[in-house]
Amino acid sequence: MSSGSIHVITGPMFSGKTSELVRRIKRFMLSNFKCIIIKHCGDNRYNEDDINKVYTHDLLFMEATASSNLSVLVPTLLNDGVQVIGIDEAQFFLDIVEFSESMANLGKTVIVAALNGDFKRELFGNVYKLLSLAETVSSLTAICVKCYCDASFSKRVTENKEVMDIGGKDKYIAVCRKCFFSN
């Protein structure tokens, strides 16, 4: 087994997870590693016409491959000699754990960016299962939009109760513990 690794970047909305993912991927690219970023095909928040880019909240972008299933990409990743795999919005991929573990066991570096919980502060997807498999876990915070303290939670500001409701500032705010419970 080659020496691969899994690195998890987690935090609430607006904490800079995608920016950190892009920064790490660019760092590997500068060292001539073959890299790819994969995003969920349902994430079209910033450009509905171009699904093959991952965007930060400040509208910086990087080329990406959009998919709803990571496992179907394995043959392409192996054939293309990809060494570093970045995955944005990993909470939306049902096969994130199996994919990340198998790629790391094949010698790939896997960098996963995902929410630390849903809008109710409950586990979101299977990302939490990666924590015990990861070499590193980076937990980011945002700034609470109400009191300007560190914010660890994402609060939905719409009435939709569906767990999967992709959006940005139009649907979510970052809040601290105290402000999560206030109106």
Swiss-Prot record:
> Into which EC class is this enzyme placed?
transferase
Pfam families annotated for this entry? TK
The residues listed in the UniProt record as binding ATP, with positions renumbered to this chain, are G11, P12, M13, F14, S15, G16, K17, T18
The record's listing under Gene3D superfamilies reads: 3.30.60.20, P-loop containing nucleotide triphosphate hydrolases (3.40.50.300)
A GO molecular function assigned to this protein is: metal ion binding
Q: Which reaction does it catalyse?
A: thymidine + ATP = dTMP + ADP + H(+)
Q: Which InterPro entries does this UniProt record tie to the protein?
A: P-loop_NTPase, Thymidine_kinase, Thymidine_kinase_CS
Q: Binding positions for substrate? A: F119, V163, M164, D165, I166, G167
Q: Where is the active site?
A: E89
The residues the record assigns to binding Zn(2+) are: C144, C147, C176, C179
One GO-annotated biological process of the protein: thymidine metabolic process
EC number(s) given by UniProt: 2.7.1.21
Q: Which domain of life is it from?
A: Viruses
UniProt keywords, alphabetically: ATP-binding, DNA synthesis, Kinase, Metal-binding, Nucleotide-binding, Transferase, Zinc
Q: Does the keyword Transport apply?
A: no
Keyword Zinc appears in the UniProt entry: yes
What does the similarity note say?
Belongs to the thymidine kinase family.
Can you name this protein? Thymidine kinase
Q: Which organism is it from?
A: Fowlpox virus (strain NVSL) (FPV)
Q: Which gene encodes it?
A: TK
